[in-house]
């Protein structure tokens, strides 16, 4: 428990009265952890949400759809056999050759693996082209809601992961240490926190919330989202064995929570992030399984940190802002699954202002890929992006990433085990998974 005191009182600030019992893996000295100033304040009234690996509530749980509740605090009172939530962080280097993507989840979807409901998904591309895919299960998960920040700790006897987000959501930090791998990510936001429908959080002074039948946090049926950091400046430091990597570039942080597993609520999705010149791009296009094959949209475009475009419409309109999404096949990098697109063209169209922005995402390198058979599966790319406002002399270049996913109509548990249960195989998982998929 000594390390716990050090972690809570040192790295994550004193929690004078919060009862945080996290007696797991010590964080050690963490010489690699970046130092940063944290605002002073009263830390005697922190709320603690704690789950153990196999803890599951019986029956319904509290499931928040509130647009006024702070985006970072837990949206579920606990988890039952279906609901889940995630804190996601990502970074891409200025060169476009290095990347890190991490997701901290409380999710019972794959409890049949027998490893519990708490996991950290970890995807990394090193500058030398090395790709790393990790799925780690932990023994405990604790989220600490304090007046100045929200902190999370996913922890086991031999590995630890942690994050901290300032309450104004302008800064985020992530740390991890698995013995073989350790690292940190620091994000300084350049954008405004917002909800799935583009509503700024909190509302600007004098602005009142419009009552809607569709919750502001709803991304698609059963799936909910907020984006505390749609884009920001990133520094990351990673050590894997004797290899080290430092990234200076761009990144983001999202919150997701859902009423059931990805396989039950979605048939697939497209996600795109982009950072070029004064622009930050965020585009989500889930394909609903609950509302058969209907695509839903959440498109946000920032310029100089200000939200200049937001829409949940994906078809041309004369009345409301909308987005257009097209596949491109003229490039050199594609996935090995059925979708052979080498990039996407994304347009943001505003009839009310007469403005259109067009951005071409060209796949630069593959970040990860996992197949489910029949050409379906998940592929992530590092992208090179070119674009700007149409009809002007704007033509900026930058970096980003994208995901393309198509899930099978039916999926057996052993197939999920191959793809998502790779953590069950420990350090041999990539070798075994690649072997299985090569003969599938």
UniProtKB/Swiss-Prot annotation:
Keyword Acetylation part of the UniProt annotation: no
Top-level enzyme category: isomerase
Classification via InterPro entries: DA_C
Glycan-bearing residues: 80, 155, 332
UniProtKB keywords: Glycoprotein, Isomerase, Signal
EC number: 5.5.1.-
Protein family (similarity comment): Belongs to the Diels-Alderase family.
Its biological purpose: Diels-Alderase; part of the gene cluster that mediates the biosynthesis of myceliothermophins, mycotoxins that contain a trans-fused decalin ring system connected to a conjugated 3-pyrrolin-2-one moiety and that have potential anti-tumor properties. The polyketide synthase module (PKS) of the PKS-NRPS mycA is responsible for the synthesis of the octaketide backbone. The downstream nonribosomal peptide synthetase (NRPS) module then amidates the carboxyl end of the octaketide with a leucine.
Protein name: Diels-Alderase mycB
Organism, as annotated: Thermothelomyces thermophilus (strain ATCC 42464 / BCRC 31852 / DSM 1799)
